[in-house]
Amino acid sequence: MPQPLRIGFFLDGFTLKKVNDYYRNVHRFHSCLDFRSLRLWVESQAIRYFEGDKFRELQMESHYYHPYRDPHVFARDCEGVLKLEHVLEPAGYSVHFNNPAEAGCVGPNLLLMEDALLFAMYRKLDAVVLLSTQGEYAPLPDRLRLMGIPTLVLGWDFVYPKAKSYVRWKTDSCLRRSCAHYVAMEKILDNDLNSKAPRGFFFQCEHPFSKGRNPRPKVAVGRDPHAPRRLN
């Protein structure tokens, strides 16, 4: 019986932050990615790209790399980060913070590349799935290929108006060329069938780690919320 296919799913939190901002504020779905649905979709696609749809048991570890420092240590700007952590862990992700970053700086967490290479060096992986658009990770697929490990990159390319100009967000060309397989996620997600979890990729309800979220029900001022409602 063949050994399980061991996949490492490495998610660049800096890219996902920009992508979620786009889908929440600009795109017609006005929602954020559902992490559990994303992970399950990646599992199915890993078999397709790395095994050609041949049946093989799969083992996948999912890792989310924050662009922010650990709020448990530095205790700054932690409200939204902690809420996101409480969403990621139940969805099956290990969370890694960007502690080498300076205060106030937000960017790709390069510990992602170090960890992926370390897993590969110790033969813990057969293939890697990288969700990122950032050129900082462009050397990773080539280094993994030298160890016999192919890389599937999930990237985006979209444009939207902002103020008097346009914002263009796209996958770095070097990262795209160096990987074994590339998926244009904007084409996968831009489908009404994918607009609601669990069938699709997006949260059905309000963004669960929004700073402005108020979990308490709205109550009319001056009215007892437990009083029976009068019927007209």
Language model region names:
Residues 50-52, 191, 205, 223:
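Intrinsic disorder/low-complexity signal
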Residues 213-215, 221-227:
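Intrinsic, low-complexity polybasic segments
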Residues 79-212:
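Nuclease catalytic cores that cleave nucleic-acid phosphodiester bonds
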